[in-house]
């Protein structure tokens, strides 16, 4: 009876011990992870400092190389000037040039067009013809021409203000006073405040010409023989002198 009870107690102790060890391992794992993060931060900071220092070092090296190159070129220039003899003391004899032929153009006047890939070197002494083309001389402008000034542009005309349109009044023809007037016709005005209408009268009938009465026409107009007292009888004897 005591055997199985002792075995059960041993399993419980083992379980508790294993559980305690597991908690301890988890705690150690977290501590090591924190230490690892700190070490990574330090490593990143060191790498940044290293790159910054390398850049500064390269700048100083470039400055040193430039100064050494300038010293070397200065020393080489001094050695060349000391080793070469003075040419100004012994001038070289001038060669006689043959006069150019009339038909053959001089090589200095010929100018080849520059190519896009290989540009030609500029000549040392430009010809007088090219210099005259480069800078042509013009007579100065007269003072009267320079004194003239362009007329200033006229300012823009101001826009006219739009006036409000007034209501139009009706114009109706009124008949003559001698015509009979019928009843007045009233029309309302177009304005809001116009309440009085204009009195209009009907148009009178058209007047017909009076009938011709044949009895009123004098009989002398229908007679063939005229009276002797007419003022136009003596026109037949009128003579007109036309100068030649």
From Swiss-Prot:
GO terms for cellular component: Ino80 complex. Residues 10-54 form a coiled coil. It comes from the Eukaryota. Residues 99-115, 122-136 have a biased composition (Low complexity). Keywords: Coiled coil, DNA damage, DNA recombination, DNA repair, Isopeptide bond, Nucleus, Transcription, Transcription regulation, Ubl conjugation. It is found in: Nucleus. Its main location: nucleus. There is a cross-link at residues 159, 171 (Glycyl lysine isopeptide (Lys-Gly) (interchain with G-Cter in SUMO2)). GO terms for biological process: chromatin remodeling; DNA recombination; DNA repair. Residues 157-171 have a biased composition (Basic residues). It holds the Pfam family INO80E. Residues 59-187, 222-244 are annotated as: Disordered. InterPro entries: INO80E (IPR026678), INO80E_N (IPR056515). Residues 230-244 have a biased composition (Acidic residues). Putative regulatory component of the chromatin remodeling INO80 complex which is involved in transcriptional regulation, DNA replication and probably DNA repair. Component of the chromatin remodeling INO80 complex; specifically part of a complex module associated with the N-terminus of INO80. This is INO80 complex subunit E. It comes from Bos taurus. The gene is INO80E.
């Amino acid at each position: 009876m005591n055997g199985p009870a002792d075995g059960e107690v041993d399993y419980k102790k083992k379980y508790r011990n294993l559980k305690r060890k597991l908690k301890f391992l988890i705690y150690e794992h977290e501590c090591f992870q924190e230490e690892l993060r700190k070490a990574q931060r330090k490593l990143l900071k060191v790498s940044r400092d290293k790159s910054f220092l390398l850049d500064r070092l390269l700048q100083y090296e470039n400055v040193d190389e430039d100064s050494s190159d300038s010293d070397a070129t200065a020393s080489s220039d001094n050695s060349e000037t000391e080793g070469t003899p003075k040419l100004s003391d012994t001038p070289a004899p001038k060669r006689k040039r043959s006069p150019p032929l009339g038909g053959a153009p001089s090589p200095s006047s010929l100018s080849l067009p520059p190519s896009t890939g290989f540009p030609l070197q500029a000549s040392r002494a430009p010809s007088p013809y090219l210099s005259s083309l480069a800078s042509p001389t013009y007579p100065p402008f007269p003072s009267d021409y320079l004194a003239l000034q362009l007329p200033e542009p006229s300012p823009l005309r101001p826009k006219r203000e739009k006036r409000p349109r007034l209501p139009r009044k009706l114009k109706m023809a009124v008949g003559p006073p001698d015509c009979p007037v019928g009843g007045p016709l009233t029309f309302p005005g177009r304005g809001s405040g116009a309440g009085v209408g204009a009195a209009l009268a009907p148009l009178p009938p058209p007047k017909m010409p009076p009938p011709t009465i044949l009895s009123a026409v004098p009989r002398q107009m229908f007679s063939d023989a005229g009276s002797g007292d007419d003022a136009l009888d003596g026109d037949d004897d009128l003579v007109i002198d036309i100068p030649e």
